[in-house]
Amino acid sequence: MENTILIGVITQDQDKEKSKEYLDELEFLTTTAGGVVVKRFTQNLDTPNPKTFLGSGKIKEVLNFIDAVKVQTVIFDDELSPAQERNISKIFNCKILDRTNLILDI
């Protein structure tokens, strides 16, 4: 069982309630794959950061949590580009998945 955190972005096209529904579904998929969700993070963004998907402040917040709780996996509710996945993996130093990769893992 891997300690896992979920990350979702709330955009102008998606309200908080819809984001919660998506994260609920992602948590179910994570549990099905054998992960244990220890925290959820969300960020309000008009458009995701092309390099790291999240803003720098949220990256620091998530990184501090990863270090404190010994998280092994971070799962994003949205699809990441290969470059974003690489960049985030270097920063967080743990396994990074997006929704599509999680579903393929199941």
Residue ranges and their predicted role:
Residues 1-105:
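N-terminal accessory targeting/assembly segments
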